[in-house]
């Protein structure tokens, strides 16, 4: 985002997803002092004597510069400060689809609006005090949420629960700092500092910070999810496994080896974790140039996956081809699925003992999927109990909170070394600055630019 973009401009953007297919509704949003005049210039209410009232929808038509009707639509004006940005905001609710919505946006730009930059509506909401920085980031998280749990966490952040926790910590630290600075300025008029009680309050704050930091890893997992690639030689049941796991017939299943020649993708949620599931082409040497390209692409995607699911055929046993594939991926996070166990020999199959996560399955019958999901959760969480999070930190917030914790540890060391109160004060201020970076009370323009540039246009 361009930090020099004038905040006095009236901005406009498409606020709904733009897809090639026809959508039912498309929304063009404006914010700024000229939002209402611009909409009035291109929107004709159906009622001739219609009155523009804040937060009231009007029915009518959007017209181009020649007066030709572009669409039948609804318009709404939200007078400052009762709007998302705390500026005058207006919206045009059109029929969905690219042509109508883009034509409506162009008319807004013709009337003097500037095309909004990514995240500029949320940036204005932040700069105008409507939301803090944790809430702004939660807007992006809510839009990008890929699981119910991630959406709930983002909504809690949007409601200010994380920001409230951080501000409460800042207030407690400010209280500790006030006691220090009072004794620096008025030492003769005050009793000696009760260091033990003061330090107990400091440690209580550190405990709260540590509890918040513990949410970061799980929160990141719920936000970003994991990429899982199903690999193996041809005709071992990889496509059947993908279909059974995703609950959809996404991949073609036949008895012919080499049927899957490209990567088939599916998305699902496993125990709250978003999973991007990739069914790759069977790995084998082949003279078929199309299949060979599929195999090469599969190998590249497997290298980029977070977790590999190696599928073998229980009836055929552990073959030389299976062993060769395993050797190439053995140092990666791995789950071994022993498919077609209903056809396995009674004496069992000798397998490499170091493979910890093994799941027997009959993919064609949907058997083994719960066990596979359990193994995946164990692998990505390293077997640690997972909290049911209400709020969690993102990477930026966690880094700032770690800075705050490090500063407070420096205070503890200063106390142990019996250093003067000035040293305590310096590190307390460092912790306060780090906490202020989380909520946006102390933040640089470059960091704001980095945060809001990740938003989509219209948010």
From Swiss-Prot:
What CDD domains has UniProt attached to this entry?
Answer: trmE, TrmE_N
Binding annotation for (6S)-5-formyl-5,6,7,8-tetrahydrofolate: 29, 91, 130, 459
Which coarse location class applies to the principal site listed for this UniProt protein?
Answer: cytoplasm
Name of the featured protein: tRNA modification GTPase MnmE
EC number(s) from the headed UniProt entry: 3.6.-.-
Cofactor mode of binding and number, as noted: Binds 1 potassium ion per subunit.
Which residues are listed as membrane-spanning? none
What Pfam families does the record tag this protein with? MMR_HSR1 (PF01926), MnmE_helical (PF12631), TrmE_N (PF10396)
Which family, according to UniProt?
Answer: Belongs to the TRAFAC class TrmE-Era-EngA-EngB-Septin-like GTPase superfamily. TrmE GTPase family.
| UniProt GO molecular function | GTP binding; GTPase activity; metal ion binding
Describe the task this protein carries out.
Exhibits a very high intrinsic GTPase hydrolysis rate. Involved in the addition of a carboxymethylaminomethyl (cmnm) group at the wobble position (U34) of certain tRNAs, forming tRNA-cmnm(5)s(2)U34.
Q: Which cofactor does it need?
A: K(+)
- The gene designation is mnmE
Q: Which InterPro entries match?
A: G_TrmE, GTP-bd, GTP-bd_TrmE_N, GTPase_MnmE, MnmE_dom2, MnmE_helical, P-loop_NTPase, Small_GTP-bd
Q: Which UniProt keywords apply?
A: Cytoplasm, GTP-binding, Hydrolase, Magnesium, Metal-binding, Nucleotide-binding, Potassium, tRNA processing
Q: Which positions are annotated as binding Mg(2+)?
A: 239, 260
State its location(s). Cytoplasm
